[in-house]
């Protein structure tokens, strides 16, 4: 969280308007620590939403392990360099396949609006239109690490995850640097 202690100050500086740089050295170890915790969660899930699926039996754990792990980025209008750096680092660290970037069309949406308005803006702006047939095929049945720089309302992550699930991803796990 950007309003907390610890790395919050460094995160606030990194997310400031106009800043687009790679993750600074001071944040790299904490980012990888969070990535490790996320990896443990990814290994413990099957991607199903029901209560029974959250408890993976010994018989089904091998099925989960066989699912490919992919990294998908959400295009950033303000910090494309930062998001790509995070995505490459996570893919490398977690041995995930870099799969693609969810495109963003239209003008940037406002964050100071009601939830329904924000959802409508986000839903109309995210797209998989630029994805190749090969990338779409590799998405089917995959576990996905969804990478973005920060989140506020959560709608971008929710809509992007929904798009990926509808396109065939078995599970989607969000990863963001900061939460406002």
Report residues per predicted region:
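Active-site-facing substrate-recognition patch
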Residues: 1-68, 80, 84, 88, ...
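Short glycine-rich phosphate-binding loop at a beta-alpha junction
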Residues: 63-76, 145
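Residue-level signal for inorganic ion chemistry
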Residues: 70-72, 118, 172
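Short helix-loop-beta junction
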Residues: 88-97
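Residues at the starts of beta-strands that form the adenosine-phosphate
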Residues: 97-98, 143, 170-173
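Mobile, glycine- and charge-enriched loop segments
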Residues: 134-147, 151
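Acidic, divalent-metal-coordinating active-site segment for phosphoryl/phosphodiester hydrolysis
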Residues: 148-160
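PRPP-dependent phosphoribosyltransferase catalytic core
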Residues: 158-180
